């Protein structure tokens, strides 16, 4: 859960740098490695998105490029 929280903080930092906000998120594709508590994951994502509902895809992977990393989120955002 800590890596998921950190991933969202990185997303928000990049959104701010581009003068964007959560409402500008269009699509999230999340890759997870290992066992995850579904209820905790859903609660964290819901709290981070604060009611915004972009298109989302969740995939479980055997591994990511760095074995220490257990979560990766590919984000699309758009604004005028």
Q: What are the roles of these predicted feature ranges?
A:
Residues 1-80:
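Short, polar/acidic, helix-capping and beta-turn segments at strand->helix junctions
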